[in-house]
């Protein structure tokens, strides 16, 4: 989707990187995909979770580095959470790892704020936090982008919209696990009428 297109656009500008392209006719052919993956140095997966897991299963070349933008491997054993800002050693860990899971958009903002506070003991791991996260509509994929950029766009889309308020959002698992929290935060994701960008707010009580 949009993530893959952005990565490709940025890499095309680099003279030190050669992109391996699959014939569009064979993009869903597992043999053709496996060939491309295994002759690469680095493969980015910008796929739904199930498809990402299937793609990882195609890897036979141990030298291939997989960077997965889906939620499939963010808390999985054997995968490095790709947020170098977490510690002074994290950058080298991400660089050397053969399996890197890209943080979710909401989760990345939350983890960046909360992880150091828990790590330093300022916020106890047992606390139940709340988080409000505003995001642009591009994160919703092609369908949502089309809705927001349509000439017949509903007036209702001009205001921020909450969604996923049942505490089942796919980013909650990594928010909790990476920060070492014992309880999932109460999460309010909100999509807004701008293309991309994030604003993440985590209120803290003075008694902490």
Outline where the language-model segments fall.
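N-terminal Rossmann-like NAD(P) cofactor-binding subdomain of oxidoreductases
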Residues: 1-163
């Amino acid at each position: 989707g949009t993530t893959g297109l952005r990565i490709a656009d940025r890499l095309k500008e680099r003279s030190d990187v050669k992109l391996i392209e699959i014939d569009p006719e064979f993009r869903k052919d597992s043999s053709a995909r496996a060939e491309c993956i295994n002759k690469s140095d680095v493969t980015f997966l910008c796929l739904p979770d199930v498809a990402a897991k299937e793609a990882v299963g195609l890897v036979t070349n141990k030298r291939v580095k997989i960077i997965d933008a889906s939620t499939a491997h963010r808390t999985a054993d054997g995968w490095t959470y790709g947020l170098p800002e977490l510690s002074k050693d994290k950058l080298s860990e991400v660089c050397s790892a053969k399996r890197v899971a890209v943080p979710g958009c909401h989760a990345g903002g939350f983890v960046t704020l909360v992880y150091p506070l828990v790590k330093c003991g300022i916020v106890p791991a047992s606390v139940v936090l709340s988080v409000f996260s505003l995001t642009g509509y591009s994160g919703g994929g092609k369908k949502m982008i089309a809705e927001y950029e349509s000439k017949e766009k509903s007036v209702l889309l001009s205001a921020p919209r909450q969604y996923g308020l049942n505490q089942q959002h796919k980013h909650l698992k990594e928010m909790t696990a990476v920060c070492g929290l014992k309880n999932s935060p109460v999460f309010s994701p909100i999509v807004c009428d701008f293309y991309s960008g994030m604003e993440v707010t985590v209120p803290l009580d003075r008694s902490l």
